[in-house]
A protein has these predicted regions:
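Conserved positions in beta-strands of structured domains
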Residues: 18-21, 83, 88, 102-104
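Hydrophobic beta-strand-centered segment that forms part of the acyl-chain substrate-binding groove
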Residues: 61-98
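Small-residue-enriched segments and motifs
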Residues: 15-18, 80, 99-101, 127
């Protein structure tokens, strides 16, 4: 796919997505390999804040991909709320996280998503997130 920095506004050291894997319908997928130098890593594990930021950037990459494909400027997005965040285990350095973002509802500039993070097909985290796009 495209260079991830072409799809999201974040820059190092806060980039929390390595690759946008594409989308079909309302579901998109992204990838992050947890590295030791990640600012959200402590004691060789990725924090809850890191997972939430990864989820938000995964949703942003979908928006970026759609807007870029239409040759339109990519809007900034902001987390409005995070609900029902659940984590069964913290990703460790070296883990390869695949995240699925499903669009639940889009109304004007507000999008409600459901996110699920996997390591080797094991679901390790999930949440719902409300995102506001700046128009």
């Amino acid at each position: 796919m495209d260079n991830i920095l072409d799809l999201i506004p974040q820059r190092a050291p806060i980039v929390m997505i390595d690759e946008f894997l594409g989308f079909k319908g309302e579901i998109s997928r992204s990838r992050l390999v947890v590295r030791e130098d990640n600012i959200f890593v402590d004691d060789n594990t990725l924090s809850e804040c890191g997972l939430i930021e990864h989820i938000a950037q995964s949703a942003a990459a979908r928006v970026g991909y759609i807007f870029k494909s239409k040759d339109m400027p990519i809007p900034l997005g902001f987390i409005g709320s995070v609900n029902n965040f659940a984590i069964s285990r913290h990703p460790a350095v070296g883990d390869d996280i695949i995240t699925e973002i499903e669009i639940i509802q889009e109304v004007l500039s507000i999008t409600l998503i459901e996110a699920r993070c996997f390591i080797n097909d094991e679901e390790i985290a999930s949440c719902r997130m409300k995102i506001f796009l700046q128009q």
